[in-house]
UniProtKB/Swiss-Prot annotation:
PROSITE patterns in the record: MGS
One annotated Gene Ontology cellular component of this protein: cytosol
Pathway: Purine metabolism; IMP biosynthesis via de novo pathway; 5-formamido-1-(5-phospho-D-ribosyl)imidazole-4-carboxamide from 5-amino-1-(5-phospho-D-ribosyl)imidazole-4-carboxamide (10-formyl THF route): step 1/1; Purine metabolism; IMP biosynthesis via de novo pathway; IMP from 5-formamido-1-(5-phospho-D-ribosyl)imidazole-4-carboxamide: step 1/1
Name listed for the protein in its UniProt record: Bifunctional purine biosynthesis protein PurH
Enzyme Commission number(s) from the entry: 2.1.2.3, 3.5.4.10
UniProt keyword list: Hydrolase, Multifunctional enzyme, Purine biosynthesis, Transferase
GO molecular function annotation: IMP cyclohydrolase activity; phosphoribosylaminoimidazolecarboxamide formyltransferase activity
Length: 529
């Protein structure tokens, strides 16, 4: 039999009150004595529950505006006391055992995320007594249950009912792990916040705070184990951030199909992030982390049809992302035309899911609609270190563009230029994208020489019989030589959009003028490695 411990006395002190009333009522109904502090105690008393204030229990009042509430031997002795070993000393000092501690911590992350949060506000939201109780209870998990997540309330009551008011050691150990994870994440947030302020605090920077802390503490939660990683000899798992607000592959719900692989997740992320760039109904098809077809139209069906035409060969076994609900007609077009690994969309109709269900290997994910892009950090692991940078959310508006050629772009060329510029951001460098009438017609990705990416994009368009004449070309970075412009002109490109900034910009612009090409500078680069 598991080492059960009956729950006779519980201390409840929570910042997040979700579910606490019902949980406290369930504990009380099972004969558990309730201790509590401050606002939690008042809330429970208002609901008619018999609750003892910790200050009454210890005989010592809360003080210093609530900074000192639970830091008392009667509290921590009751939590840390080892049953069967410390009984005599506990009895001598009138310390009653506390069998369960229910605590979640001051909302530090929410506080510092608020605009205008001062250092004083942040400091006052650093919990002291809470983490101390959490760690004490987790340390003594052989005798005490520590509860830090409201999502565990129902399971705890269910287990108590199955074990005559007791919890097993396995459960207490699992709860202790969650508790240490909780306090580690909490302390990491505080360390990151203060670490980012070190230069400014010591007068080493004119900025209010640095973007990157002195020590970077990261906390991710394992969502799933993978069968293997990028290759079959590599073990892997998928970890996600807690409380992600933006629709993403990490928050998406899989509504159909077998488990996602490591490569599925990476490619789905690439497809979804690309399709988010567009306001019109859009489709992005990705293969090996690169878009192989992108289009916008009046419907996602037409957008898919046009994206597929860019490169049907590469689309086989690809990932398809939409920025509108997946409907039955589009689902049918996909299933009848190609093999697809993953389809991701904000939502999917029931009829669409019935159609995709006919193909058991097709994974369908719904991620919800996204209102806005959320700034964050990108990470790249190198041997012995971690490169950290802001997410590339850089965008350019039509008003920010600079036409540097003699010829001005037509309205259609300008639309196509802005369209393929958005796509180029998600193509591996060196990236070249040809587009015409809101669809990609050729994509050159990942070449060591930019001119070869331009040539490949032209070859891809020719292979599919797509008309390049009058198209726009986007380059993720500047052209170091005029050869890329010459290659584009040779296949009929009439407009080029690029960041500019080369020491040979004059030569490159002159090449555009020679060929009658309109050239636009964005003054923003989008390397992707």
């Amino acid at each position: 039999m598991q080492q059960r411990r009956p729950v006779r006395r519980a201390l409840l002190s929570v910042s997040d009150k979700a579910g606490i009333i019902e949980f406290a009522q369930a504990l009380s109904a099972r004969g558990v004595e309730l201790l509590s502090t401050g606002g939690t105690a008042r809330l429970l008393a208002e609901k008619g529950l018999a609750v003892t204030e910790v200050s009454d229990y210890t005989g010592f009042p809360e003080m210093m505006d609530g900074r000192v509430k639970t830091l008392h031997p009667k509290v921590h002795g009751g939590i840390l006391g080892r049953r069967g070993q410390d009984d005599a000393i506990m009895e001598q000092h009138h310390i009653a055992p506390i069998d369960m501690v229910v605590v979640n911590l001051y909302p530090f992350a929410e506080t510092v995320a608020r605009e205008g949060c001062s250092l004083e506000d942040a400091v006052e939201n650093i919990d002291i007594g809470g983490p101390t109780m959490v760690r004490s209870a987790a340390k003594n998990h052989k005798d005490v249950a520590i509860v830090v997540k409201s999502s565990d309330y129902d399971a705890i009551i269910k287990e108590m009912d199955a074990n005559e008011g007791s919890l097993t050691l396995d459960t207490r150990f699992d709860l202790a792990i969650k508790a240490f994870e909780h306090t580690a994440a909490y302390d990491s947030m505080i360390a990151n916040y203060f670490g980012s302020m070190v230069p400014a605090y010591h007068g080493e920077s004119k900025e209010a705070a640095g973007r990157f802390p002195r020590t970077l503490n990261l906390n991710f939660i394992k969502k799933q184990d993978m069968r293997y990683g990028e290759n079959s000899h590599q073990q892997a798992a998928f970890y996600i951030e807690e409380n992600v607000k933006e629709a993403s592959v990490a928050t998406a719900q899989q509504v159909q199909g077998k488990a996602l692989s490591y490569n599925n997740i990476a490619d789905t992320d690439a497809a979804l992030e690309c399709v988010k760039e567009f306001n019109e109904p859009a489709c992005v098809i990705v293969k090996h982390a690169n878009p192989c077809g992108v289009a916008v139209s009046t419907t996602i069906l037409d957008a898919y049809d046009r994206a597929y035409k860019t490169d049907p060969t590469s689309a086989f076994g690809g990932i398809i992302a939409f920025n509108r609900e997946l409907d039955a007609e589009t689902a049918q077009a996909i299933i009848s035309r190609q093999f697809v690994e993953v389809i991701i969309a904000p939502s999917a109709t029931e009829d669409a899911l019935k159609i995709t269900a006919a193909k058991q290997n097709v994974r369908v994910l719904t991620c919800g609609q996204w209102a806005q892009r959320v700034p964050g950090l990108d990470f790249k692991r190198v041997n012995g270190g971690l490169l950290v940078q802001d997410r590339d959310l850089g965008m350019v508006s039509e008003a920010e563009l600079r036409v540097v050629s003699k010829r001005q772009p037509t309205e259609q060329e300008l639309r196509d230029a802005l369209f393929c510029w958005k796509v180029a951001k998600f193509v591996k460098s060196n990236a070249i994208v040809y587009a015409k009438e809101n669809m990609t017609i050729g994509i050159g990705a990942g070449q060591m020489s930019r001119v070869y990416s331009a040539k490949i994009a032209g070859i891809k368009a020719a292979d599919e019989g797509l008309e390049v004449k009058g198209s726009a070309m986007a380059s993720d970075a500047f052209f170091p030589f005029r050869d890329g412009i010459d290659a584009a002109a040779a296949v009929g490109v009439s407009c080029v959009i690029q960041p500019g900034g080369s020491i040979r910009d004059d030569e490159v612009i002159a090449a555009a003028d020679e060929h009658g090409i309109a050239m636009i500078f964005t003054d923003m680069r989008h390397f992707r490695h």
